[in-house]
C-alpha cells in the first residue's frame, strides 16, 4: 500500500486480505480472552487497510464467501484518496491492485488430488513409475533444465493420475473437469514433483511459467517504469 501510494510500485494480482488492526487480548473468566482494537494501520495517503464488516451480520461474516473460502469482494466505496501523482485509490478493503488478475477457477479437488498422487509417486508406491521415486530431497534454490527433464510430466503420467483420481471418490472430479483443466494439472504436477525433489522454492520456480499473475506482472514492466519516471519528475518539482 505504501509503495502504491508513493507511486513506487505498479501492483498486479488480487486484492489483499484487508486485515489492518492492532489488537490486544484481555483475559476474562473461564480462560477466555476479549480482543480489543487499540489502533488501525493506514497507508501514507490515509487509506485504512482494514476491511469494513460493520454492514454485515456475524452469520454473513462466516458464510458469505466464494468457492475458495474468501469473503465475496465488493467494489471500493467512499471518498477516493490519491497517490503522490494523483491516481485515485480507495481504502476499507485491503489493497486493490492496479491490474487485477485472478487465478483460474481450478477446482480445489484437483489441487489436492495432484498433491496426494505425487506424494505416492515420490514414495515409489505407483507401479510402472519407479524412476519417479525420490529417496531424499536435495534442496535447490535454482532449477536447471536437467532438473525438470529428470522427472517429466508425460502423457503416461497424466493418464495414471486420471485413473488414480477416478478411483478416489473423495475428489469427485468429472471427465469434463479433468479435460477442461488439463494444462493446470500438468503444471501442478510439475510443481509438486519439483517440490518433492528439490524443495518448496524449486516447486514455485517450476510453476512460474504457468502462473498467469506472474506472466502479467512481467508484461507490466514498461508500465511500472513509466510510473516511476512520472514519480521522479513529480519529486523534482
Question: What are the roles of these predicted feature ranges?
Answer:
Residues 18, 43, 226-227:
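Short beta-strands and strand-coil junctions in structured, solvent-facing domains, enriched
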Residues 48-49, 53-237:
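Conserved functional hotspot residues or short segments at active or partner-binding sites
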Residues 1-34, 40:
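Cleft-lining beta-strand/loop regions that shape enzyme active-site pockets
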Residues 24, 36-57:
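Extended catalytic-interface subdomain
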Residues 29, 44-45, 84:
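Short, ordered coil/turn segments that flank beta-strands lining enzyme active or ligand-binding pockets
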Amino acid at each position: 500500500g505504501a509503495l502504491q501510494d508513493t507511486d513506487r510500485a505498479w501492483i498486479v494480482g488480487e486484492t489483499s486480505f484487508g486485515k489492518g488492526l492492532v489488537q490486544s487480548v484481555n483475559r476474562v473468566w473461564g480462560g477466555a480472552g476479549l480482543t480489543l482494537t487499540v489502533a488501525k494501520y493506514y497507508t501514507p495517503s490515509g487509506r485504512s487497510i482494514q476491511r469494513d464488516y460493520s454492514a454485515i451480520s456475524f452469520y454473513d461474516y462466516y458464510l458469505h464467501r466464494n468457492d475458495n473460502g474468501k469473503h465475496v469482494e465488493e467494489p471500493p466505496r467512499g471518498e477516493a484518496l490519491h497517490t503522490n501523482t494523483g491516481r485515485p485509490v480507495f481504502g476499507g478493503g485491503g489493497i486493490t491492485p492496479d491490474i487485477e488478475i485472478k487465478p483460474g477457477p481450478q477446482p480445489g479437488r484437483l489441487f489436492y488430488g495432484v498433491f496426494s498422487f505425487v506424494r505416492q509417486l515420490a514414495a515409489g508406491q505407483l507401479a510402472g513409475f519407479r524412476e519417479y521415486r525420490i529417496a531424499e530431497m536435495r534442496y535447490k534454490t535454482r532449477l536447471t533444465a536437467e532438473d525438470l527433464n529428470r522427472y517429466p510430466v508425460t502423457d503416461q503420467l497424466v493418464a495414471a493420475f486420471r485413473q488414480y483420481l477416478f478411483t478416489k471418490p473423495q475428489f469427485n472430479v468429472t471427465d469434463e473437469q479433468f479435460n477442461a483443466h488439463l494444462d493446470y494439472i500438468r503444471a501442478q504436477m510439475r510443481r509438486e514433483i519439483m517440490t518433492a525433489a528439490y524443495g518448496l522454492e524449486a516447486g514455485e520456480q517450476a510453476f512460474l511459467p504457468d502462473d498467469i499473475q506472474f506472466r502479467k506482472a512481467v508484461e507490466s514492466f514498461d508500465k511500472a517504469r513509466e510510473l516511476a519516471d512520472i514519480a521522479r519528475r513529480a519529486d523534482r518539482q
